[in-house]
Swiss-Prot record:
This is Pleurain-A4. Antimicrobial peptide. Has activity against Gram-positive and -negative bacteria, and fungi. Has little hemolytic activity on red blood cells. InterPro entries: Frog_antimicrobial_propeptide (IPR004275). Residues 1-22 form the signal peptide.
Length: 69
């Protein structure tokens, strides 16, 4: 049960971060006075995940959650 709570908290935390990143991108685009195309949105999501290095982050999280370090 405790592991489930950790996982849910982690998912909530990562969701909050991704929402804040999207909001920052949207605010930056509103300053330009133009709307982003669908392709630009997809491209920004891909670059954000590459920059965040999610696979390494997931390995560290799993290591700490399951004490396999």
């Amino acid at each position: 049960m405790f592991t489930l709570k950790k996982t849910l908290l982690l998912l909530f935390f990562l969701g909050t971060i991704s929402i804040s990143l999207c909001k920052q991108e949207r605010d930056a685009d509103e300053d330009d006075g133009r709307k982003m195309t669908e392709e630009e949105v997809k491209r920004s999501i891909i670059t954000t995940t590459k920059e965040a290095k999610l696979p390494q982050l997931w390995k560290q999280i799993a290591c700490r959650l399951y004490n396999t370090c």
